[in-house]
Amino acid sequence: MYTNKMISFVKLVFGVLGAIMLGTTPVWAHAANQGFVLLLPTTAYIAGGTVTVALTILLLIFAKPGAIDAVMQPVPLRFRASTLPLRDWSQSTGALCLALLILIGLRGPTDPQANLLPLVIWTVWWMLFFVVQALIFDLWSWINPFPAVHRILMSEHRVILNLPSRLSIWPAVVLMAAFQGFVLADTAPNDPDRLAVFALGYWALTLGGMTVFGREAWLKQVECFSVLFALIGLIRMGRSNRLGLPGWQLLQDRDHDLSHAIFVVII
């Protein structure tokens, strides 16, 4: 039997829905971002994806407990070079290059095909870096432009506020979602002037965040591109002075939580 409270609640829900429907208005839409052209035959993509999924399922079915851990153990290497001073210089070079690209975006040609900023951002950085970071070496830690300026301007800076570790990388999830929204919903993400303003604003946000919460904490938990390339680097076979099969770092580093999973889904 329906009670008077249940009937009143149903009426309230339908009343709210009706008010929302009556208050709707037409909205503007656009064609979103351009599609990616598959240069290889489509059959190659389909076959590669099918084989990958099939092998993954077979591995999960027939692999004995602990067998994967034994196979994925890395082999220690006998050398480990200290490259910290050289990395500081390379990051400073990366910051200088980013500043020049932003200047080119603001003052250069308005045609995205003729301006260097969109070409470098969307072709070199957003595509080529993924391959290098995942297969060859940790390129992002060498050219990351964000810590370089902060290190130069505030070499002896003290943290103003502590970023709680329990937040994990949820702040980076929010920033990555905002970035993906810019790429997908903006009417002209390739426009040099618009892209330069976005890059400059994000650089200022990152510099301010590192000033308040500290360089290491901000880059590890909030700066979405540092988090992105750190996760991609977990696929790489080599790390520091160890070498193993692709993915061994994922088994060694078990500090990932739900925020990391959501971050990967957003990508």
Please report, for each region that a protein language model flagged, where it lies by residue:
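N-terminal secretory/membrane targeting signals
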Residues: 2-29
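A broadly tuned "polar low-complexity/structure-edge" signature
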Residues: 2, 17-20, 102, 231, ...
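Transmembrane-helix bundle segments that line or gate the permeation/cavity pathway
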Residues: 18, 26-244
